[in-house]
Amino acid sequence: MVIANSNIIFVAGLGGIGLDTSREIVKSGPKNLVLLDRIDNPAAIAELSALNPKVTVTFYPYDVTVPLAETKKLLKTIFDKLKTVDLLINGAGILDDHQIERTIAVNFTGTVNTTTAIMDFWDKRNGGPGGVIANICSVTGFNSIYQVPVYSASKAAALSFTNSLARLASVTGVTAYSINPGITKTVLVHKFNSWLNVEPRVAELLLEHPTQTTVQCAQNFVKAIEANQNGAIWKLDLGRLDPIEWTKHWDSGI
């Protein structure tokens, strides 16, 4: 996918990996970058706008846990304004296994609902033009960090959902791939809670292992966007971008 002159919606593009990815996207010159985030960050929006004045950067407040109808209403506002959207990035995520319901609501249900909502505008069965979805999942969707089983399971669910979306592209006209960062130096991983406090030092122990910067992750994220491979499972770890070959142990046969 060519980022230049495209219209992109980025959910949770104002913090951590998201903000650095927004910076890299803006450098590539899209026509519009629409940021949907729970928390407003005027300084970051001003920075992004100044980084490339040719790009229109717009912000709308959005909590991915709102009812589906509210998400559809927000997307209608955006589509009415832009007319077309080329790429949706679902990036909302939390890491706190004390918050079981919210972890699932943000990391999985929010991705499902935002994706479901945009189908009203993209699905070729309704006369839509199709589109591209990039879902930020995690390497914990491959192999869990067992001390945070709720987080890991939510990311595995998001990965499975994304793989299914890719298989449905011939039906909907919407392609999809997953972005799976490894351990990245963000606020998210500096302090978080394990499930039932099974390992109080989980964040500290995790950071003893090699990590990557948010900039490294963001630069590889943009490479994945440009590659635009339906069904790709991208691992973004230790400053590298690698495709993952998914091992099939069972097939529904349909």
UniProtKB/Swiss-Prot annotation:
<dbReference type="Pfam" id="PF00106">
    <property type="entry name" value="adh_short"/>
</dbReference>
<keyword id="KW-0560">Oxidoreductase</keyword>
<dbReference type="GO" id="GO:0004022">
    <property type="term" value="F:alcohol dehydrogenase (NAD+) activity"/>
</dbReference>
<comment type="similarity">
    <text>Belongs to the short-chain dehydrogenases/reductases (SDR) family.</text>
</comment>
<keyword id="KW-0520">NAD</keyword>
<dbReference type="InterPro" id="IPR036291">
    <property type="entry name" value="NAD(P)-bd_dom_sf"/>
</dbReference>
<protein>
    <recommendedName>
        <fullName>Alcohol dehydrogenase</fullName>
        <ecNumber>1.1.1.1</ecNumber>
    </recommendedName>
</protein>
<dbReference type="GO" id="GO:0006066">
    <property type="term" value="P:alcohol metabolic process"/>
</dbReference>
<feature type="binding site">
    <location>
        <position position="138"/>
    </location>
    <ligand>
        <name>substrate</name>
    </ligand>
</feature>
<feature type="active site" description="Proton acceptor">
    <location>
        <position position="151"/>
    </location>
</feature>
<dbReference type="InterPro" id="IPR002425">
    <property type="entry name" value="ADH_Drosophila-type"/>
</dbReference>
<dbReference type="InterPro" id="IPR020904">
    <property type="entry name" value="Sc_DH/Rdtase_CS"/>
</dbReference>
<dbReference type="InterPro" id="IPR002347">
    <property type="entry name" value="SDR_fam"/>
</dbReference>
<feature type="binding site">
    <location>
        <begin position="10"/>
        <end position="33"/>
    </location>
    <ligand>
        <name>NAD(+)</name>
    </ligand>
</feature>
<dbReference type="GO" id="GO:0005737">
    <property type="term" value="C:cytoplasm"/>
</dbReference>
<comment type="subunit">
    <text>Homodimer.</text>
</comment>
